[in-house]
Amino acid sequence: MKKTLMLLAMVVALVILPFFINHGGEYGGSDGEAESQIQALAPQYKPWFQPLYEPASGEIESLLFTLQGSLGAAVIFYILGYCKGKQRRDDRA
């Protein structure tokens, strides 16, 4: 019980602490950071690929990103569960 409470307190601290450490900081994505580095290193660079679909807003882009991650996690955990169930079935036989 004590160990569980200690782990829970650590998880809560890890979630909340970054908001106080970097208060007022800007949370940018890696795409934006990569784009700024490319522009700094090679200003003449022209992208050779355009996205097939450009979301109408940032909210839709976030939704699609979240759905993609959720679908990927569902596939991974389905496969893990399937393999675990198959292993249990084989152990019983």
Swiss-Prot record:
It is a multi-pass membrane protein. One of its GO terms (cellular component) is plasma membrane. NCBIfam families: cbiN (TIGR01165), PRK02898.1 (NF002780). Coiled coil: none annotated. The chain crosses the membrane at residues 5-25, 63-83. This is Cobalt transport protein CbiN. The gene is cbiN. It is found in: Cell inner membrane.
